[in-house]
């Protein structure tokens, strides 16, 4: 991991590669580098740290070569260092390669290569590819790449250049995303469309085992056997503005403020003649009615959206539902039948563990639905149907608008299953849909009105070393997301627990000034949450309560209150999540943290 770019064309590659790497910074990384064909040799420069450091170094060179590759690295094999940064080169320096993924048999390959006299200069698994290419190269870089990949076990997205083939980039992939596009001035390759967004909107999403030979004049696609194949072109409707902050101090705040639009866009066209319509799922009402078990599988923030979905699907459709972390689901033996529905939730659509879980579920006979933000992503392609969250590109590492889009999409799915099962009548569907649509306006109110109370609470908590998030029902599910957001971007340790579990352990943590953040909105379990607040307050906790507007009683039990509009309990996760996002961001800003690119994190986890 983490980001690949490449260009071959009419213009100097250096600036194009740096621009592409800058746009991939949001994915998280610890070092960066480029390789450019300069004259009859390769110029390779890499630096530990930010792309800006690499750009500063390159300002002293001003390479004019028009073909090159670049990479931002998030360490998997080998510590973050200049030596471990990509691109990696062959012994003679004639071939350079960049790689996303993990090569599982690299230790065995390295031992063999060293035994044949190859000298390694890094700790990475990627460097074995450069040496394999060197051994296999006989004048055709794509053929050498095909030979090298026949010996590799693992996941990879690879791009390579050779000084003996001017203007050529060889590309392939297996279980790691690669997109290729032809612009007016040349050919582009990247691990993420946003790196080439100003050059083309029509891209080819390379398939597993497919190869591309890129030149300034065109791109040739072949399969593992070397036979020509027709590319599948996907049009992506993203604006260049997505890669800009648009006047906000950071992408996270911008994306938080985009959430009302995400709700509206995700719901657009979903109610037809009073009934829910999600044609992309490609299952008839009769087939949906046969579903008797649901698994929601996801990782990180998406897992928390799945917890909310579990409550809604069981509550409305009365179908037994489990929400499981994808990396755990795939390594046990879940009960799956042809009437089992597996719902895979992934912002990027390329999360490695989620993809592996999908494949396992399909082998066992399950129907698979995907919920993702990326058109044409692996999750979308490998599912029987897909709901797109319509959040557009999310740049900040900590998910906000994509999370809300997932919650809205999963809410629609719960309503659709209940409709198919006959558990919700048409008039109930229409009422729920209208109230769900109204949450967009309620989120706008939160964004407009809650800033003072959120910032006051953040200042009170910024110097804490730990925090506890609690809630019941929907509040418990959203507490997990609040705690994750806080620790992701502020590095303040936070845990989340169902409030009813307080006396079973977590209450031992509480002493004078210990922050307890509670979801205390009006709900069937409101009185029990208040009881938990009283227990915490009696032990010296500093209480921050997210509460329903008009609830004056909560002030007796909380030091800080953040009021949000009253909504149906089923939709409370949508409105309650927004102040928790803003709260986490405010604390991170107070602590001087980089909210868009928190340390050690990657936006998209494409390795296991």
Task: For every predicted segment, state its role.
Residues 1-245, 249, 261-292, 331, ...:
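Conserved short alpha-helical segments that host acidic/polar catalytic motifs at enzyme active sites
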Residues 7-10, 99, 119, 134-138, ...:
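Hydrophobic alpha-helical scaffolding
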Residues 226, 542, 555-557, 567-608:
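Generic C-terminus detector
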Residues 259-263, 267-295, 385-515, 588-608:
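Active-site phosphate/pyrophosphate-binding segments
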């Amino acid at each position: 991991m983490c980001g690949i770019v490449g260009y071959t064309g009419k213009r100097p590659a250096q600036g194009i590669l740096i621009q592409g790497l800058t746009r991939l910074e949001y994915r998280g990384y610890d070092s960066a580098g480029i390789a450019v064909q300069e004259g009859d040799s390769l110029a390779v420069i890499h630096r530990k740290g930010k792309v800006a450091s690499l750009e500063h170094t390159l300002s002293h060179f001003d390479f004019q070569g028009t073909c090159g590759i670049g990479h931002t690295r998030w360490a998997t094999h080998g510590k973050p260092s200049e030596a471990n940064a990509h691109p990696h080169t062959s012994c003679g320096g004639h071939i350079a390669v960049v790689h996303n993924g993990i090569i599982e048999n690299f230790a065995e390959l390295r031992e063999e290569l060293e035994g044949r006299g190859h000298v390694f200069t890094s700790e990475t698994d990627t460097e074995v590819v450069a040496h394999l290419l060197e051994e296999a190269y006989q004048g055709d870089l794509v053929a050498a790449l095909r030979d090298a990949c026949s010996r590799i076990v693992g996941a990879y997205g690879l791009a390579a250049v050779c000084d003996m083939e001017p203007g050529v980039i060889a590309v392939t992939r297996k279980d790691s995303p690669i997109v290729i596009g032809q612009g007016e001035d040349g050919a582009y390759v990247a691990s993420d469309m946003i790196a080439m967004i100003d050059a083309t909107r029509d891209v080819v999403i390379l398939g597993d085992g497919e190869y591309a030979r890129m030149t300034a004049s065109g791109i040739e696609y072949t399969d593992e056997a070397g036979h020509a194949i027709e590319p599948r072109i996907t049009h992506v409707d993203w604006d260049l503005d997505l890669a800009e902050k648009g006047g906000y101090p950071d992408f996270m705040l911008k994306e938080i403020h985009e959430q009302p639009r995400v709700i509206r866009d995700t719901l657009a066209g979903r109610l037809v003649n009073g009934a829910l319509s999600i044609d992309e799922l490609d299952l008839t009402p009769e087939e949906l009615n046969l579903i008797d078990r649901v698994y929601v599988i996801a990782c990180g923030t998406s897992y928390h959206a799945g917890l909310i979905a579990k409550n809604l699907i069981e509550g409305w459709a009365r179908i037994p539902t489990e929400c499981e972390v994808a990396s755990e689901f795939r390594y046990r033996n879940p009960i799956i039948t042809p009437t089992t529905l597996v719902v895979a939730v992934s912002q990027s659509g390329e999360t490695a563990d989620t993809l592996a879980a999908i494949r396992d579920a399909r082998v066992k006979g399950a129907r698979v639905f995907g919920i993702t933000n990326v058109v044409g992503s692996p999750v979308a392609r490998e599912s029987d149907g897909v709901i797109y969250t319509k959040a557009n590109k999310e740049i900040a590492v900590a998910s906000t608008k994509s999370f809300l889009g997932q919650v809205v999409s999963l809410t629609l799915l719960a309503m659709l299953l209940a409709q198919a099962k006959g558990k919700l009548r048409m008039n109930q569907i229409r009422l729920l849909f209208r109230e769900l649509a109204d949450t967009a306006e309620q989120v706008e109110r939160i964004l407009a009105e809650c800033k003072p109370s959120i910032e006051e609470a953040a200042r009170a908590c910024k110097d804490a070393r730990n925090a506890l998030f609690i809630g019941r029902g929907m509040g418990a599910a959203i507490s997990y997301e609040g705690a994750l957001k806080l620790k992701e971007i502020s590095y303040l340790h936070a845990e989340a627990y169902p409030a009813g579990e307080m006396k079973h352990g977590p209450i031992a943590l509480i002493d004078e000034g210990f922050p307890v953040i509670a979801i205390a909105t009006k709900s069937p379990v409101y009185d029990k949450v208040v009881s938990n607040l009283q227990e915490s307050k009696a032990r010296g906790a500093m209480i921050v309560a997210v509460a329903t507007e008009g609830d004056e009683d909560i002030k007796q039990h909380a030091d800080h209150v953040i009021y949000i509009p009253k909504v149906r309990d089923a939709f409370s996760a949508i409105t309650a999540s927004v102040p928790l996002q803003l709260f986490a961001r405010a604390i991170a800003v107070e602590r001087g943290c980089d909210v868009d690119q928190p340390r050690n994190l990657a936006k998209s986890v494409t390795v296991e």
